[in-house]
Amino acid sequence: YGSAFGDRLVHVRGNHDSYHGHVFADFPMQEVVVEGATLAVLDTARLGQVNGSISAEQIDWLAELASRTDTQVLVFGHHHVWNPELDPRRDDFFGIRPADSEALFEVFARRHNLTGYLAGHTHRNRRMHIAEAGGAPFVEVACVKDFPGAVAEYRIHDGGIVQVFRRISEPEALRWSERTRQMYEGGYGAYAFGRLADRCFTMADRRARTAVAT
């Protein structure tokens, strides 16, 4: 992808990178400014572990970034958050550990220009609104490698940011994608694809909603 995107390509580690102690893209925090928004990229990987964490340093950095920018902020990390309404409270939770997820929710609840949090890891499409985070959306995006073979595109507008779901198109890649659809006794397809509302949607600028409510 480097040949296509050049210095616009930003990497964040996942759990498979951390298993072998790779330092590739080992950047705890990255700030990327684009027209109309700021991208806050967090390394949630834990050395040799499948699940993720967010440090106090990263939380403080995110809060400071949100306090000094007047744009919408999209937050990216590999691991998805723990959902207090759905997930058992365990430190070996598959995504970001519960206490760290709660620290992230607290920043979202205070900083309304944090528009949403975007993750991979689960290889599925899912969107959750977390009450403890002020109702902000926490999103998981399916992977390129397996069904449905997808990437997410983000379009920045005044008043919100739109997620557009895009599938791979090369015939050979599609053939492989259809093979992986049958994993887990045929249940993987429905798990990974998610609902239409999990794939294409608008994340509203939460500052506008707060102003109306006030």
Give residue spans per PLM region.
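A short C-terminal boundary segment appended to hydrolase-like catalytic domains
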Residues: 157-214
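Short acidic-hydrophobic surface loop/beta-edge motif
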Residues: 28-35, 128-132
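Conserved hydrophobic/aromatic beta-strand scaffold that supports enzyme active sites
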Residues: 31, 39-41, 151-153
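Active-site-proximal beta-strand elements of phosphoester/diester hydrolases
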Residues: 36-46, 74-76, 137-142, 164-168
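Core catalytic region of metal-dependent phosphoesterases/phosphodiesterases
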Residues: 1-28, 100
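Active-site/pore-lining binding-face segments in mid-to-C-terminal subdomains
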Residues: 113, 120-172
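His/acidic metal-ligating clusters that form di-metal
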Residues: 40, 49-137, 187-211
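Catalytic metal-binding/acid-base residues of hydrolase active sites
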Residues: 15-18, 45, 80, 121-125, ...
